[in-house]
């Protein structure tokens, strides 16, 4: 019997709710079978579009959603009772889901019919994406509230998507992906169990609603074996740790986006082949096949994909699902000695690392003591070193670099660009929204939200009330900040200089030593991340490399204002300021830093 195809998505959203809605309708008309919403950084980090930290970030890497009016526009003409919607949202996941539910209630749609997923994995935010806001304990409380609320009110909703995807994007090895992601899942489920609001049978069903979001890299056999190991280990953990009896509730359910870290700016047309090969690893093995797949576009190393670029990735999925005979056969790898041995070894190694994390107190302790972050920073450094040394071949980057001019990028930059007016228009619309809403309703809703946050009352009902009253993203988050506080995650950077035999590094180190001797002190290098971009692995690797070259490095983590960076540079008397900005806001933010420096 032929299997049904996986859910086919493209990760999309930019500029405004209106433009993103047009993009969604266009993609759905081409055969996409689910939505995957990308939010801009202010929305992800809980700021309204007019906040100082939102400057330059509005609409850049996703769609800005400040209130229920924006959500109405975003999902206009999209039937919520028929759509499977994935939202890549974490610290503010409870709020964005509340807006979604409030819109469904407004349209008289039965909550039982809402299908979708909120990513809602805050532990990996501390480790990779950097959109966390609150400390671990209250963050896990918010996740627990969402899990128990959706179990009772939205039975078809996946409240948490445990993400190993982002761990691979910052350098995790396959065994680290397995162990870190499973430790994260256990941390969330343990918190739900401790809340003691569900019966044993209800908790077993909650376990069955946990889903995962994984990565698939270019090492095809290893990645496929990793997925089979995930299936076995999750069955093992849910059975032995939680006593889940029903095999359906022990099933490893996952969606995937294939690797973006390996997409290259050089010869970007080669990325099409990388994307296809990486996808094969998660769809060929029937017993470990993804339930949903979204593919990056070939040009994501260059910038924001255009509609045509997204269509190309969509067609790739459709050809594999509908033209090939892949879905007509049982698992192709059952009985393979090579596969079985590889899977078993990965399970042994992953259990060892998982148990090590549990012995230190679990994933949250591993965040707080920086163990998990340091492991990822070190793994990523090893990966980069292998590429720099030529041990790991990347076609077009360190081998086969000669190329003809690509017709795909010959006539323009080959990417979508965001109109600079978007931010001003969004701020103007936000001010109009505030002016025209019923402030009495807003004040009442915020008061109830504060009461819920300060008590053990589930946060979701008060959040839905706030959404219906017209509360904004920034206002909801400010309540949580006031009650829970904020958290700056460890950077994972150490000043331990590691010996290298790379000639380029050794040459730079000689020059650093010579200049330092001449000036009477070590070259001091401040690495700053202004704005809201939390993808810190680039900055971390620059910090590690600069330290290895003999510089004194100052790196204070993510989400700094231009004024804070300039203040630190003066107080620390640095020689060099380096900036890492991956959200497309570099021109504006660099300009602001230069202006601040001139004032001093």
Give residue ranges: language-model regions:
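Cofactor-cradling patches in redox/metallo enzymes
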Residues: 539-600
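Catalytic alpha/beta active-site cores
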Residues: 1-223, 241, 248-257, 289-296, ...
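Short beta-alpha connecting loops at secondary-structure transitions
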Residues: 55-60, 85, 124-133, 167-171, ...
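Glycine-rich anion/phosphate-binding loop at the beta-strand->alpha-helix junction
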Residues: 182-185, 213-215, 220-305, 309-313
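Flexible, glycine-rich loop/tail regions that form catalytic "lids" or insertion modules at the edges
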Residues: 306-307, 311-318, 322-507, 562, ...
């Amino acid at each position: 019997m032929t299997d049904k195809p996986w859910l086919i998505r493209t990760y999309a959203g930019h500029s405004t709710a209106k433009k993103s809605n047009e993009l969604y309708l266009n993609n759905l008309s081409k055969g996409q079978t689910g939505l995957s919403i990308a939010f801009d950084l202010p929305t992800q980090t809980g700021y309204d579009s007019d906040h100082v930290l939102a400057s330059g970030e509005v609409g850049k890497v996703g769609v800005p959603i400040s209130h229920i009016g924006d959500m109405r526009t975003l999902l206009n003409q999209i039937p919520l009772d028929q759509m499977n919607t994935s939202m890549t949202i974490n610290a503010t996941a409870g709020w964005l889901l509340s807006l979604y539910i409030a819109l469904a209630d407004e349209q008289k749609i039965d909550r039982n019919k809402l299908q979708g997923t909120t990513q809602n994995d805050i532990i990996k935010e501390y480790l990779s994406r950097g959109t966390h806001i609150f400390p671990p304990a209250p963050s896990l409380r918010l996740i627990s509230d969402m899990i128990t609320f959706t179990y009772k009110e939205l039975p078809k909703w996946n409240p948490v998507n445990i993400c190993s995807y982002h761990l691979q994007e910052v350098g995790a090895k396959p065994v680290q992906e397995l162990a870190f992601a499973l430790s994260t899942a256990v941390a969330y489920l343990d918190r739900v169990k401790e809340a003691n609001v569900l019966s044993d049978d209800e908790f077993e069903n909650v376990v069955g609603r946990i889903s995962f979001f994984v990565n698939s890299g270019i090492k095809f056999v290893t990645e496929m074996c990793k997925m089979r190991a995930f299936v076995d280990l999750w069955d093992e953990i849910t059975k032995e740790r939680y006593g889940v009896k029903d095999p359906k509730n022990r099933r490893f359910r996952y969606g995937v986006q294939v690797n973006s870290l390996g997409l290259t700016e050089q010869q970007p047309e080669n990325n099409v082949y990388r994307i296809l090969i990486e996808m094969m690893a998660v769809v060929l093995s029937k017993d470990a096949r993804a339930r949903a797949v979204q593919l990056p576009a070939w040009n994501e190393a260059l910038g924001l994909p255009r509609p045509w670029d997204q269509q190309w990735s969509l067609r790739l999925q459709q050809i594999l699902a509908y033209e090939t005979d892949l879905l007509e056969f049982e698992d192709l790898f059952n009985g393979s000695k090579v596969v079985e041995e590889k899977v078993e070894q990965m399970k042994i190694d992953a259990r060892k690392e998982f148990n090590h994390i549990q012995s230190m107190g679990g994933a949250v302790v591993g965040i707080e003591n920086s163990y998990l972050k340091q492991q990822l920073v070190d793994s990523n450094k090893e990966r980069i070193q292998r590429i720099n040394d030529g041990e790991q071949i990347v076609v077009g980057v360190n081998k086969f670099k000669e190329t003809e001019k690509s017709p795909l990028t010959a006539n323009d930059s080959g990417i979508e660009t965001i109109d600079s007016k978007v931010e001003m228009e969004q701020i103007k619309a936000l001010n109009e929204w505030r002016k025209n809403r019923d402030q009495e309703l807003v004040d009442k809703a915020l008061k109830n939200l504060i009461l819920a946050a300060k008590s053990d009352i589930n946060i979701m009902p008060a959040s839905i009330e706030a959404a219906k009253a017209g509360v904004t993203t920034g206002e909801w988050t400010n309540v949580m900040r006031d009650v829970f506080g904020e958290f700056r995650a460890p950077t994972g950077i150490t000043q331990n200089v590691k010996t290298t035999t790379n000639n380029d590094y050794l040459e730079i180190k000689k020059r650093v030593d010579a200049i330092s001797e001449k000036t009477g002190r070590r070259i001091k290098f401040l690495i700053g991340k202004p704005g809201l971009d939390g993808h810190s692995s680039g900055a971390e690797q620059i910090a590690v490399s600069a330290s290895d070259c003999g510089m004194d490095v100052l790196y204070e983590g993510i989400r700094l204002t231009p004024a804070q960076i300039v203040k630190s540079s003066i107080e620390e008397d640095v020689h060099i300021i380096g900036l890492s900005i991956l959200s497309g806001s570099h021109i504006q933010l660099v300009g602001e830093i230069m202006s601040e420096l001139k004032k001093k």
